Amino acid sequence: MKHLVLASGNAGKLEELRAMLAGLPLRIVAQGELGVDDVPETGLTFVENALIKARHASAVTGLPALADDSGLIVDALDGAPGLYSARYAGSPTNALANNAKLLDAMRGVPAERRSARFYAVIVLLRHPEDPQPLIAEGSWEGTITTEPRGDGGFGYNPVFLDPVYGLTAAEMDSALKNRLSHRAVALATLQHKLHALSL
């Protein structure tokens, strides 16, 4: 079985990615298990940040690396929190504070203007200098609630409502969420390529 390092220190992302990749003939290893620290995300786009993370993890471990960079894009806030979703309310990352700041910023915004989407970019590098990284993107359309709902998931899940199911991401069971999410869409785009790679 081939090894693949997941370049993330976010426990919620790691759990989701591991579940989504479970059917592949790969041994998935979190970067923390290999002593790889998080690297500063200094890119100006989701793609740049994902490449930075994957390149760092691959360089330190010598293994192929998969990295995700994602965020919540809210139309009424001109795309915020966007690239800075994890640090929207400041550092260190605090999901409760981020959600509170978002709901405060959205106070008084009518229902028809509360559209948002989760967006993810997933990058696969076969080695640190890989000149042709595999890049896939995915999005999940929804709206922002007026108050948090649900106990599942992480991050902005309690305030992101899927209009088709009428549930927030935090109210969904993991099987449903892992089928609909922005990461699931991006991974589905990438998955068939993983089978053909010499990892």
Swiss-Prot record:
Pfam families: Ham1p_like (PF01725). Homodimer. Mg(2+) binds at residue 69. CDD domains: HAM1. Its cofactor is Mg(2+). Binds 1 Mg(2+) ion per subunit. InterPro entries: dITP/XTP_pyrophosphatase, ITPase-like_fam, RdgB/HAM1. Keywords: Hydrolase, Magnesium, Metal-binding, Nucleotide metabolism, Nucleotide-binding. HAMAP family: Non_canon_purine_NTPase. GO terms for cellular component: cytosol. GO terms for molecular function: dITP diphosphatase activity; ITP diphosphatase activity; metal ion binding; nucleotide binding; ribonucleoside triphosphate phosphatase activity; XTP diphosphatase activity. Substrate binds at residues 8-13, 70, 154-157, 177, 182-183. It catalyses: XTP + H2O = XMP + diphosphate + H(+); dITP + H2O = dIMP + diphosphate + H(+); ITP + H2O = IMP + diphosphate + H(+). This is dITP/XTP pyrophosphatase. The active site is at residue 69. It is an enzyme of class 3 (hydrolase). Pyrophosphatase that catalyzes the hydrolysis of nucleoside triphosphates to their monophosphate derivatives, with a high preference for the non-canonical purine nucleotides XTP (xanthosine triphosphate), dITP (deoxyinosine triphosphate) and ITP. Seems to function as a house-cleaning enzyme that removes non-canonical purine nucleotides from the nucleotide pool, thus preventing their incorporation into DNA/RNA and avoiding chromosomal lesions. GO terms for biological process: nucleotide metabolic process; purine nucleoside triphosphate catabolic process. Belongs to the HAM1 NTPase family. It comes from the Bacteria. The lineage of its organism: Bacteria, Pseudomonadati, Pseudomonadota, Gammaproteobacteria, Lysobacterales. Its EC number is 3.6.1.66.
